[in-house]
Amino acid sequence: DKHIPVAAGMAGGSADAAAALKAMNMLFGLNLSDEQLMEHGVKLGADVPYCIMQGTALSEGIGEILTPLPPMPDCLIVIAKPAIGESTKWVYQNLKVDLLEEHPDIDGMADALKTGDLKGITDRMANVLETVTIPANPVIDSVKKLIAENDSMGVLMSGSGPTVFGIYDNRDKELAQRVVDMLREKDEIQAAYAVSPYNIRRGM
């Protein structure tokens, strides 16, 4: 029972495809391994292999090269979905890689995950797709500012957008909920939640 909308930058469509592949594998007794399902899944969408594997991972290539990483440290995540959708294809078509001035610190992020350093993770959060999606949808920047101004450890657009998420320490549960309440009062916000990381133990 999931409620991830499509065109939200949260792999909602890919999660549906991954669930369908796993269900068919079970219902028809195909006995395909996750690796085999992932090979089929990438033909449907770049994020499908990740949704089949689950957990925290470094994704490379177009999404088919996955390296497992330690789970996200326990925290609170405020998620806000503006009442708009965005085409992933359009965002990637308009990304000017050669004009990017900064690139995410992938190695530093991996090290922070390995040591469970939540601040190290939030300090390294970056998304180059913001350079495309935010200028076309200023509401995303407004949502980011609201969350940032309410003491989040870090705030970022998810995937190709328009969903935004902010990270809060577990001790700030009341603050995170107040931010959610503020977001829900805004007409331009379709949905807002405060959740915890859903960490999957692989192989179970």
Give the predicted meaning of each segment.
Residues 164:
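Surface-exposed aromatic
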Residues 158:
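Flexible nucleotide-binding loop
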Residues 8-34:
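DPxDG-like acidic metal-binding loop motif
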Residues 1-9, 153-155:
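Short pre-catalytic strand/loop immediately N-terminal to key active-site residues, enriched for Gly-Thr
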Residues 30-153, 167-204:
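ATP-dependent small-molecule kinase catalytic core of the GHMP/sugar-kinase superfamily
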